[in-house]
């Protein structure tokens, strides 16, 4: 029996959510450009859902916002939290209306395997631990990326980018002997360097999710 030419199947994906808190697009873009400059490759071509729940009026120029984001090579897949008027504008612009999903009561499965790297990760290098944790005995340099579907443990300085829970595992953590990262991310929630500096003083720490926000805890000496 021949296979059908198409199939419709359910699937879940981890998307970054851009929260717009002001209808002043010049101010929004100035702040966004500052964040993009800190981690340009991380956001390049990244699919985004735009959250408009903080905009309780209809004065936002959604068409202009879409054009400004596209000009920065960001891909808008839809909006969420919009007023009725803005939702209609979004549909006219070909954007999907995304409803927030319910939190699953079933905990994510434990990582099935661990990838161990016994060397420094240098600028331009990327290491990915699929379906498991990543343990690095060494430093992660500026411009390097380490990614894991599970947790990331770095027995050295983290100066590049670390993305744990890449497949959506919200229980994943990032542990490093020195937190100096350009970017850290767990299940799509991320901090740039400036956010990390507000919560850490370049010392050892454990970054985890607390609800939908990241937090950092000191490690016992």
Curated annotation (Swiss-Prot):
Q: Does the keyword Cell cycle apply?
A: yes
Name a Pfam family for this protein.
MinC_N
Biological process terms from the Gene Ontology for this record are: cell morphogenesis; division septum assembly; regulation of cell division; regulation of cell septum assembly
Cited InterPro entries: CAP/MinC_C, MinC, MinC_C_sf, MinC_N, Septum_form_inhib_MinC_C
Entry keyword set: Cell cycle, Cell division, Septation
Top-level taxon in the UniProt lineage: Bacteria
Provide the function of this protein. Cell division inhibitor that blocks the formation of polar Z ring septums. Rapidly oscillates between the poles of the cell to destabilize FtsZ filaments that have formed before they mature into polar Z rings. Prevents FtsZ polymerization.
Quaternary organization: Interacts with MinD and FtsZ.
Q: Which family does it belong to?
A: Belongs to the MinC family.
Q: What is this protein called?
A: Probable septum site-determining protein MinC
């Amino acid at each position: 029996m021949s296979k059908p030419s198409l199939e419709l199947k359910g699937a879940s994906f981890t998307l970054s959510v851009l929260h717009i808190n002001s209808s002043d697009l010049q101010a929004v873009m100035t702040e966004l450009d500052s964040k993009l400059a800190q981690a340009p490759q991380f956001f390049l071509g990244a699919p985004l859902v735009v959250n408009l729940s903080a905009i309780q009026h209809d004065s936002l120029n959604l068409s202009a916002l879409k054009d400004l984001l596209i000009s920065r090579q960001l891909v808008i897949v839809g909006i969420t939290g919009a007023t009725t008027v803005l939702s209609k504008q979004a549909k006219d612009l070909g954007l999907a209306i995304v409803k927030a999903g319910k939190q699953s009561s079933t905990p994510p499965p434990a990582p099935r395997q661990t990838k161990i790297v016994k060397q420094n990760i240098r600028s331009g290098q990327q290491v990915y631990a699929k379906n498991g944790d990543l343990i690095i005995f060494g430093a992660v340099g500026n411009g390097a990326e380490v990614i894991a579907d599970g947790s990331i443990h770095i027995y050295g300085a983290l100066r590049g980018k670390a993305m744990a829970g890449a497949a959506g595992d919200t229980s994943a953590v990032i542990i490093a002997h020195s937190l100096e990262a350009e970017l850290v991310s767990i299940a799509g929630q991320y901090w740039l360097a400036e956010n990390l500096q507000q919560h850490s003083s370049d010392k050892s720490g454990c970054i985890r999710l607390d609800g939908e926000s990241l937090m950092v805890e000191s490690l016992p000496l």
